[in-house]
């Protein structure tokens, strides 16, 4: 029943969409960006990592609003190493590119949006902003919006503050022993 369907959704999300081995959640007040990258890369079991900013907000239309997380990858060109952004519309690979955002499938359905439409987002601590949708990606849990660092800075007038890192471990690492 319900337990099985929740387990199935989580397995699909973490086997098909999220490709990373782990996430380090960072208290950005403790480190600057360079220190964070150095600290993570100094961990012997880490093969590669990428800093991200995750900010909570609300996406809305005239009749509906949904909680979202806006993800700003430091290196959007490497996003595919950590999250498989596949078009829900045609199965092609999506890239986080300047001038538009990628939103996830269920969010698009709930707000009746598609590629080329405009989405309204209110992030915590910011005013409502509108974004052109450059793609709708497959996703099984929660709602995400992906945007480039340059577009984030252009729209919000501030540089991203990277507060998490996606991590891939070396092949011979026991994931259960990594802390």
Task: Describe each PLM feature range.
Residues 17-18, 95, 136-176:
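Small-residue transmembrane helix packing/gating motifs
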Residues 12-16, 34-48, 52-118, 130-132, ...:
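Short beta-strand boundary microenvironments
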Residues 31-37, 172-179:
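Short, conserved charged micro-motifs
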Residues 20-31, 55-57, 168-170:
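Conserved short loop/turn motifs at secondary-structure junctions
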Residues 1-20:
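Alpha-helical transmembrane segments
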């Amino acid at each position: 029943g319900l337990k099985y369907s929740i387990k199935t959704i989580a397995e699909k999300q973490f086997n098909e969409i999220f490709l990373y081995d782990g996430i380090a959640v960072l208290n950005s007040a403790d480190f600057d960006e360079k220190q964070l990258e150095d600290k993570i890369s100094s961990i012997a079991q880490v093969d590669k990592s990428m800093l991200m900013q995750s900010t909570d907000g609300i996406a809305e239309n005239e009749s509906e609003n949904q909680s979202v997380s806006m993800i700003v990858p430091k290196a959007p060109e490497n996003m595919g190493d950590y999250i498989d952004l596949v078009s829900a519309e045609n199965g092609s690979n999506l890239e986080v590119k300047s001038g538009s955002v990628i939103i996830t499938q269920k969010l698009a359905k709930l707000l009746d949006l598609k590629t080329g439409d405009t989405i309204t987002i209110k992030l915590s601590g910011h005013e409502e902003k509108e974004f052109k949708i450059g793609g709708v990606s497959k996703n099984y849990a929660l709602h995400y919006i992906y945007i480039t660092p340059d577009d984030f800075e252009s729209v919000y007038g501030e540089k991203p503050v990277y507060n998490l890192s996606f991590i891939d471990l070396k092949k011979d690492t026991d994931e259960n022993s990594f802390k």
